[in-house]
Amino acid sequence: MNAIFYQIDFGGGVKIFWVLFPLIIGATYFTIYFKLINVRGFFTSINIVRGKYDDVEGRENHKVEVSDTVFTDDGDNPDTIRVEGHEGEVSHFQALTAALSATVGLGNIAGVAIAVSIGGAGATFWMVVAGLLGMASKFVECTLGVKYRDIEADGTVYGGPMYYLTKGLKSKGLAGLGKVLAVLFAIFVIGGSFGGGNMFQVNQAFQLVENITGGNESFLHGYGWAFGLVMAILVGIVIIGGIKSIAKVTDKIVPFMVVIYVSASLFVIFANYHMVGDAFMQIFDGAFSPEGVAGGAIGVLVQGFRRAAFSNEAGVGSASIAHSAVKTKYAASEGMVALLEPFIDTVVVCTMTALVLIITGNVTAENASLNDAQAILLTSGAFESVISWFPYVLTVAVILFAFSTMISWSYYGFQGWAYLFGRTKKMEYTYKILFCMFVVVGAAASLGSVIGFSDAMIFAMMVPNMVGLVILAPKVKDELKKYMKAIKALKV
């Protein structure tokens, strides 16, 4: 854990987590290598989600006869390895919402409050920059997730970094390295799913519910296990059906959550419209000429980049697991859809939180030492100053954020579990039962070092994933050319 969260001391009070360097450098490299795909591909990605290019898929002419008896030495069905035209399990929109549900959550509320308290308003600017760069990383990893996925005879999809590291690096003559990196990633994603994707989420949700109902005097005080049991049952009902069931829930919850939260943020902003100009002045001045911030401009930049990386997980590889289940015959089409995630998560939702905090005067150094639960209450108070009943809405939102994050991360963890232990029903149910048990534990326990460990697991995923992304970037470029050619042919 200490190795993952080792901080490089730059002097002047500035310490930077080393994991930020490969994430940001990688995102910048992909932005340049793919010629600003995060900008020039933005409207194309929206059109894909809207269904404008559905005719490009031509699925009715590309049905695949799948053998359930012939397999490779690795247990893969050769008819479904990188086969173009197979249906997959979910739509572009469902894959997008499933992946978004794992990232849009408590970090957008609590993490942003802490970031702007430490780094000042200027951290918002660098958070947006990092979010825009991260769009390119998401494009690369999610394109690879579809290209190298496995699809079983019954249509069940298995995908993500485990598969593009194994198959992709094998195609480059690096089979041994690919296998090692894939196993490491699988171990890390399982650890992350039980911790940050499960226990942390339900723990923070329960703390907020307990606080809003009276704190130590609440009727729920001491009954975290009961809250966890209810959440575990709800999670279990959804995850038992796999990605199709998860996507059916997330494609309703995620748009609802984002619309409610952004609408409330805009209400606060417009209610204080006379302060909007000053807020943006604080953001731009603070980004380049901060005063009273540890480490000056570098300190502000670090806080913005850190929050973006922790929030949208671009380069971590998790989202490619959800996107690999999409119904498409062009891998790059889903990569294009995926680049919307950091934009929605960081550029839109995180920025809204930051603006509300700045406008309502809640960006102060005294708040820098807050923990996540306290930071949620700080954000809640900022909204409450304009919308008196908003804390109740935020409580519901936090529960939904936590719930949707848990069901998506259960899928991520299961994919790693299946890669290591096999795709049998016995192994599937073993993982899902364990996952639900950890929901109860997370709600009842005081987590402490467990959270540090789970955070380390999530960012450890970045190491094997980024190695694969850089090596396989030319493959992604080929897929992009193929898809853009198909779109141009459709227009003609």
Features from the language model and the residues they span:
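N-terminal alpha-helical transmembrane segments of multi-pass membrane transport
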Residues: 1-102, 106, 117-123, 134, ...
